[in-house]
């Protein structure tokens, strides 16, 4: 969000519920149940902890949950300064307690979020923050209803089909200018009203215009036991590393000359490799292998042999370029393996320097770089000393994406 560094929004995390519909558990209410490897509330707090727009954070808990919350807080991935207050008999009164605590900090805006919605992200927070900065007094992230809706009567019989036009499913964080929503909550409490199911409803009752903003499909509330199971499965899938393997193959002809360059090492020899660049067949194969891990084409796409600027160029330039593309796309090179197929020259005496060159270019440790060599048993063009071939394999781990490549809801 542009100008985010000047924007500060108070946060109220509502975590005082007992979660009866999720069933009983030795771990306590659902906000303290483990999904992935940490409590639900720890996942939720971590997202606010890393959002630049987050100001003072107040967590509203049940008086009986002090120890549960303290334990959950220790499981957070990052640090977050926060204030803990006790909730009331209803969600509405718990939110009021949180708003009173936030008001004491002097912030202008507040986000009210359910602890049991751990799958929101910074994109949603940025969208909400931008709407507040643009003048909205109250805003509600929501998703258009896609399912057909039915209203029932006695005995579970369908009474009618409800038109879903202009119907939206409300989410949190629900966001407000602090003073109007605090005033509305105080008035609602004084009036004895306790039937509001969310904070936007109180804003509507108080005459505060509520703006809808686009919610997030994954930002669902963990209500039932099956929701917790689905959340755990989702986090388990997200934790699986995105490991990709790419292969590359290259061959260059041997012609009369004084030596060959392999993995950046010049080896004196009675012949040389023919090519537009320095014809380092090993680095060319590894360049293709790296590019293959992210679908970035091949070496010819990036350095066409028809381009005179690459005439005689050292092939480390090509490998550095491929490694940079991998990094820009979120990848970390974890292994590089090259097999050279040649009758001559002997690779063994130069193997260590070759490995050191690979490690330096790729920024990885020496034990992640492998160079092997074999003859072709005098078979084929390699066996006739007409050329040298190289086969390379690269292993790259890419950062997990917050959203899958395909919609897995169905």
Curated annotation (Swiss-Prot):
Any one GO MF annotation of this record: 2-C-methyl-D-erythritol 2,4-cyclodiphosphate synthase activity
InterPro entries on file: IspD, IspD/F, IspD/TarI, ISPD_synthase_CS, MECDP_synthase, MECDP_synthase_CS, MECDP_synthase_sf, Nucleotide-diphossugar_trans
Reactions the enzyme catalyzes: 2-C-methyl-D-erythritol 4-phosphate + CTP + H(+) = 4-CDP-2-C-methyl-D-erythritol + diphosphate; 4-CDP-2-C-methyl-D-erythritol 2-phosphate = 2-C-methyl-D-erythritol 2,4-cyclic diphosphate + CMP
UniProt KW Lyase keyword: yes
Region (2-C-methyl-D-erythritol 4-phosphate cytidylyltransferase): 1-243
Sites where the protein binds 4-CDP-2-C-methyl-D-erythritol 2-phosphate: 250-252, 276-277, 298-300, 374-377, 381, 384
Pathway: Isoprenoid biosynthesis; isopentenyl diphosphate biosynthesis via DXP pathway; isopentenyl diphosphate from 1-deoxy-D-xylulose 5-phosphate: step 2/6; Isoprenoid biosynthesis; isopentenyl diphosphate biosynthesis via DXP pathway; isopentenyl diphosphate from 1-deoxy-D-xylulose 5-phosphate: step 4/6
Site feature: Transition state stabilizer: 21, 30, 276, 375
Keyword tags: Isoprene biosynthesis, Lyase, Metal-binding, Multifunctional enzyme, Nucleotidyltransferase, Transferase
Annotated SUPFAM superfamilies: IpsF-like, Nucleotide-diphospho-sugar transferases
Cofactor(s) required, per the database record: a divalent metal cation
Site label Positions MEP for the nucleophilic attack, positions: 164, 221
Entries under Gene3D superfamilies matching the protein: 2-C-methyl-D-erythritol 2,4-cyclodiphosphate synthase (3.30.1330.50), Spore Coat Polysaccharide Biosynthesis Protein SpsA, Chain A (3.90.550.10)
2-C-methyl-D-erythritol 2,4-cyclodiphosphate synthase: annotated span: 244-410
Entry's Gene Ontology BP terms: isopentenyl diphosphate biosynthetic process, methylerythritol 4-phosphate pathway; terpenoid biosynthetic process
EC number: 2.7.7.60, 4.6.1.12
Binding site for a divalent metal cation: 250, 252, 284
Family the entry assigns: In the N-terminal section; belongs to the IspD/TarI cytidylyltransferase family. IspD subfamily.
Main function: Bifunctional enzyme that catalyzes the formation of 4-diphosphocytidyl-2-C-methyl-D-erythritol from CTP and 2-C-methyl-D-erythritol 4-phosphate (MEP) (IspD), and catalyzes the conversion of 4-diphosphocytidyl-2-C-methyl-D-erythritol 2-phosphate (CDP-ME2P) to 2-C-methyl-D-erythritol 2,4-cyclodiphosphate (ME-CPP) with a corresponding release of cytidine 5-monophosphate (CMP) (IspF).
Designated name of the protein: Bifunctional enzyme IspD/IspF
